[in-house]
């Protein structure tokens, strides 16, 4: 199964009394993208925008949380906002071609709007407001909101173009923030040294861990899946055959050949 955590949990519960059924769940994520020491802010901003807003944020691997070193916060956020302001949102065959299209339906757009307003009313600070140009259609603009000061952040997958931003002081705090979720699908580090990435890779809790790459677009030649509420096995990618089938042991000889050497009268 590939889909939301709630649906995956319901499927798992339904099949709990059926040990003959293999249940491989690839569910959603509250995915972190950490931007660390890098002078390449334009490239970092492009990775952030691709991760958060491609497909209008409707990918299980989309970045939901941007974790930024405080010393580079202003410069990076300015770059990301400038790029996000240029995004064209429209129908697939519009001209010029859009970067992102609509949400799946109006109900999804309504839910995302309510979620953004909730974050605002509970201590979030809007960096880029969520805008719905036509209330009768499910098109939403990319949105960014700083939630550093929120006392309690909902640990849910906001399946759309809302990016929550968090400031941190050091890499230990960044990794702690990245792991502050029940999910564990994908995490990316942008910038930093090879030593920083080795530390990030070893300590972050996710099934897919990237360096200087977007959170989206996992290589399906490798295992694809997560931990926690993101899933239990790897139903897609390289290990799909292991988790979506069962192994069969077989012993063979060209001809039947046997003899009983002891214990006979």
Annotate each PLM feature.
Residues 34, 117, 132, 139-265:
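Conserved C-terminal structural/oligomerization subdomain of aldehyde/semialdehyde dehydrogenase
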Residues 5-149, 211, 259-260:
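ALDH superfamily catalytic-core signature
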């Amino acid at each position: 199964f590939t889909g939301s955590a709630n649906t995956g949990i319901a499927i798992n519960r339904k099949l709990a009394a059926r040990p003959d059924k293999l249940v491989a769940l690839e569910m959603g994520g509250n995915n972190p993208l950490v931007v660390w020491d890098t002078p390449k802010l334009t490239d970092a901003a492009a990775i952030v925008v691709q991760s958060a807003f491609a497909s209008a944020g409707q990918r299980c691997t989309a970045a939901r949380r941007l974790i930024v070193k405080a010393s580079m916060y202003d410069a990076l956020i300015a770059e990301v906002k400038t790029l996000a302001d240029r995004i064209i949102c429209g129908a697939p065959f519009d001209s010029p071609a859009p970067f992102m299209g609509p949400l799946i339906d109006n109900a999804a757009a309504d839910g995302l709007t309510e979620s953004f307003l909730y974050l605002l009313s509970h201590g979030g600070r809007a960096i880029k407001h969520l805008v719905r140009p036509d209330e009768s259609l499910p098109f939403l603009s990319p949105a960014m909101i700083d939630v550093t000061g929120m006392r309690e952040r909902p640990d849910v997958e906001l399946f759309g173009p809302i990016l929550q931003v968090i400031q941190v002081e050091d890499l230990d705090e960044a990794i702690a923030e990245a792991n502050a979720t029940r999910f564990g699908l994908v995490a990316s580090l942008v910038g930093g040294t090879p030593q920083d990435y080795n530390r990030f890779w070893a300590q972050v809790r996710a099934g897919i861990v990237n360096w200087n790459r977007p959170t989206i677009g996992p290589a399906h030649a490798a295992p694809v899946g997560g931990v926690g509420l993101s899933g239990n096995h790897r139903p897609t990618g390289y290990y799909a055959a292991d988790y979506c089938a069962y192994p069969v042991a077989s012993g063979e000889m060209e001809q039947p050949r046997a003899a009983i050497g002891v214990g006979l009268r």
